[in-house]
Swiss-Prot record:
Cellular component annotations (GO), alphabetically ordered: plasma membrane
Species of the source: Escherichia coli O157:H7
Name of the protein in its database record: UPF0266 membrane protein YobD
Keywords: Cell inner membrane, Cell membrane, Membrane, Transmembrane, Transmembrane helix
Topological domain ranges for the Periplasmic compartment: 1-5, 66
Recorded superkingdom: Bacteria
Main location: membrane
Residues that span the membrane, as ranges: 6-26, 45-65, 67-87
Keyword Transmembrane helix among record annotations: yes
Similarity section: Belongs to the UPF0266 family.
Compartment(s): Cell inner membrane
Top-level taxonomy: Bacteria, Pseudomonadati, Pseudomonadota, Gammaproteobacteria, Enterobacterales
Membrane topology: Multi-pass membrane protein
Amino acid sequence: MTITDLVLILFIAALLAFAIYDQFIMPRRNGPTLLAIPLLRRGRIDSVIFVGLIVILIYNNVTNHGALITTWLLSALALMGFYIFWIRVPKIIFKQKGFFFANVWIEYSRIKAMNLSEDGVLVMQLEQRRLLIRVRNIDDLERIYKLLVSTQ
């Protein structure tokens, strides 16, 4: 096993740990989930480039008769990238005292102002940062509003 294979195993383990945390651990942290809203995905061009580069590496490894374990590890990395970027749905998870947005816990007390833009983006102003929340279904904005009013 080469250093390349060890690095590939490390990246696969990191992506797998992130996927497990995102799917199973995060929804159970900080109390029961009051509301989970699916969000719009950002540009997918980055994911296409990532998976495309991995496919090029697989092709290069096969044509140069590289190690079979490296080909399998590259394939596993491509599948993990495909899952993370294309299958997994980003979401905002509301709890009793705060919410998870982009896997970061934000307490309700940190929200200084909220606005709704013309194109349906909820803008939350924190102390030093703005959150742009793009929901998949525009009706979910009303559900978020009702939840925030009832918890504040």
